[in-house]
Amino acid sequence: MITGCAENAGTSGDKESGMYTMHGLTTQEFVTEMGAGINLGNTFESCGAWIDSESVTNFETGWGSPVVTKELIQGYKNEGFGALRVPVAWSNMMLENYQIHPDYLARVKVVVEWALEADLAVILNIHWDSGWWENFPTDKENCMEKYTSIWTQLCDAFGEYGDKLMFESLNEEAGWSSIWDRYSGTEEQKAESYALVNEINQTFVDLVRASGGNNAERHLLIAGYITDVALTCDPLYKMPEDPAGKCAVSVHYYTPATYCILKQDADWGKAKKAWGSPRDYGELETNMDLLYDTFVSKGVPVIIGEFGVETANKEADNVKLFLSAVFTEARERDMCPVLWDITNVFYDRTTFQMVEEYSDLNEMLTAPVE
């Protein structure tokens, strides 16, 4: 049972409400309408053996998030965001035979409903989930059984919701260094790793479409190769065949990594404290052009499912410069950028508005792009 949250009771809603509506948009129209999105990060995807698995709340708050409330979700909409990505570790509290715990499923369902009621598009995925993805190369049969079991249950649980709910095949785990190392692997190894990624994504599409109902026409988000821009734009990466023709591709954008990820110097790079040189802008434009030319120009919409910055040791104005630049370059090419956010970095989950230091960030990220 979930504790500490009185707003968990029930997931039944008015069947006439917009959350059950199929709008009939193309996936590109849907992605364009999203505008800018934000992640409900470090919440339902939290995991770890040290977390008491007796209640969903222990996982929901295990990585620092407060218990999610309807007001918290409505706050995203009030701040101008058009989409909410909900990362989930479905293995938490999982029962035998890969059965999702009913309490965990019910709690995520409540939050998804709150988002749909707020007129947010919702992206629902399987996240890192304690890393069981790493076993695909050596235990493909069991991993695929778990993968299909999870999505079969999710298709059933969320199948009645309208097409503002999007399913995402997986997070950024599609790619295995145990098969192919991008720096030293062979072409044969590379082909093998890409083939496995393509197989998982095709399995996902086939399963969702076969479940029928609204899932037959639901917009689907297909994970790129480790969601890396260059590797996803490689000819070996294939979008799955989809009878509905409603798939978009997902990449993540943390480039340059020395700026976006590092707090301090590491053995692989020196921490970059400022962004904005002509070279920085050129790199961003080159990557966005590559995505546009490879996918958007050929009718495949692009969602940048995560982009963000490690804010430690950086000036807020410079962080905003980078984030707004990514947003602008993405939106100018009809792509939807989804900000990676965890508790109280950019959005305050207790006051339901942007934190003071980034109080104008939402305006930058949701401003119209000419």
Model features per residue range: what roles?
Residues 50-58, 90-106, 128-145, 175-189, ...:
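Surface-exposed, active-site-proximal loop segments in enzymatic domains
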Residues 144-280, 289-310, 332-335:
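Active-site region of glycoside hydrolase catalytic domains
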Residues 314-370:
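Aromatic-rich peripheral "rim/lid" segments of glycoside hydrolase catalytic domains that contact
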Residues 20, 63-84, 94, 98-128, ...:
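An active-site-proximal structural segment forming one wall of the substrate-binding cleft
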Residues 41-68, 96-100, 139, 258-284:
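Acidic/histidine-rich helix-loop elements
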Residues 9-83:
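N-terminal carbohydrate-binding accessory modules
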Residues 2-6:
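C-terminal motif of bacterial Sec signal peptides marking the signal peptidase cleavage site
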